[in-house]
């Protein structure tokens, strides 16, 4: 499945497949080719509000459009704060690195798309697929996980 990002986001990156989806957005595997070399990134797309139903629900509870926009904009700001925190961890070998992000506001309605480009890593289930982990590998993974948690807690 080839999907294009809006041209203004990262024109050099092409989405090649969806690799995940959750309540906070969709994650795609993207590639760019530079001088014959292929590079991969994961691009998370978070849409605020997440659906037309969510927008309608908030509109029904708020007296005016400005209040609705302020509510959803505060969610965008929270998301940007989380991305900024993740950027702080860049370079730590135990935490996924954020490479770039962009926020695109809708012109025709209340809403934003937040694009977060991160290093592309093999998912744990894919890593384990079709092989049995040795005791040594399990211990190494456990230690790496503990180091990541320790680093996050300290910072």
Q: Model segments located where?
A:
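Protein kinase catalytic-loop region centered on the HRD/HxD motif
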Residues: 147-155
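Short beta-strand micro-motifs within the conserved protein kinase catalytic domain, predominantly
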Residues: 97-112
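Activation segment signature within eukaryotic-like protein kinase domains
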Residues: 141-142
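AlphaC helix of the protein kinase catalytic domain
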Residues: 124-134
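Structural motif at the C-terminus of the N-lobe alphaC helix and the adjacent alphaC-beta4 loop
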Residues: 84-93
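ATP-binding glycine-rich loop module of kinase domains
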Residues: 34-79
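Conserved N-lobe ATP-binding subsite of Hanks-type protein kinase domains
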Residues: 26
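Conserved short submotifs of the Hanks-type protein kinase catalytic core
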Residues: 109-124
């Amino acid at each position: 499945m080839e999907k294009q990002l809006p041209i203004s986001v990262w024109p050099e990156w092409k989405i090649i497949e969806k690799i995940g989806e959750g309540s906070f957005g969709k994650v795609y595997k993207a590639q760019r080719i530079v001088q014959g070399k292929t590079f991969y990134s994961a691009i998370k797309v978070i849409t605020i509000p997440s659906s037309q139903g969510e927008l309608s629900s908030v509109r029904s509870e708020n007296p005016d459009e400005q209040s609705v926009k302020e509510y959803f904009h505060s969610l965008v700001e929270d998301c940007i704060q989380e991305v900024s925190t993740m950027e702080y961890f860049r370079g730590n070998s135990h935490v996924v690195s954020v490479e770039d992000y962009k926020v695109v506001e809708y012109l025709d309605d209340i809403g934003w798309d937040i694009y977060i480009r991160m290093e592309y890593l093999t998912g744990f289930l894919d890593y384990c697929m079709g092989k049995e982990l040795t005791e040594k590998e399990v211990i190494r993974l456990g230690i790496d996980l503990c180091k990541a948690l320790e680093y996050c807690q300290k910072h």
